[in-house]
Amino acid sequence: VTAAQDLVPLPEDPLTEVAAAVLGDGHHVVLDLLDVVRHHDGPPVDVVRAGDDLLPRLAHENALDQALLMARQVLRAGGLFVAAVPELDKLGRLRPTAPPPKVTGRGAERQVTVQLWDWAADGESYALEVVRLVRGAETWEVANTVATRHRVLSPEQISASLTDAGFGTVQRLSPAECGHPLPVWVAVAPA
């Protein structure tokens, strides 16, 4: 979902599914947090979603508070902000270098995604490199790589940031509750 005028819920997207479960049946206008700036003068939307590592990346760039304020402003009364956020605050002192690889597809369509973490000395932030491998004719090939920096956010920090942005009810859903591998935060725009 990338443009306000052609917003269609993605049925395989757990964040959109969480929003639909809360809002009920019907068509819901869903906007990605990265598209909020372009949509700022558009009509209110039902849902603003933020994918897995977006909030920690925005926090590292000192842009999280402004992004959440803008998300709140584009939502209709009762609209939802839904975000998947890794909870790595307890891992900072352990400084793991990578989670297990993610494997998708079968046979010639198989892909492997690997994350590499390089922690700051204080454990409060980390560099993240994501490498996606695909099957070539005879060997694995690097399809693409992405490198970013993230700040570690505790559940308390996430809750406070959402509340400070003007959201009413703020709730954290565990992976078992929401079907996403990461905890998902749901915040309601007040009436």
Regions found by a protein language model. Give the residues of each.
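Conserved beta-strand signature within the Rossmann-like core of class I S-adenosyl-L-methionine
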Residues: 78-85
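A short glycine-rich, Lys/Arg-flanked "PGG" loop and its adjoining helix->strand segment in the class I
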Residues: 63-77
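A short SAM/SAH-binding and catalytic strip from SAM-dependent methyltransferases
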Residues: 46-63
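Class I SAM-dependent methyltransferase SAM/SAH-binding core
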Residues: 24, 28-47
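Short conserved AdoMet
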Residues: 24, 59, 76
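C-terminal lobe and adjacent flexible extensions of AdoMet/dcAdoMet transferase-like proteins
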Residues: 149-191
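SAM-dependent methyltransferase
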Residues: 85-155
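Conserved alpha-helix/loop element of class I SAM-dependent methyltransferases that forms part
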Residues: 6-29
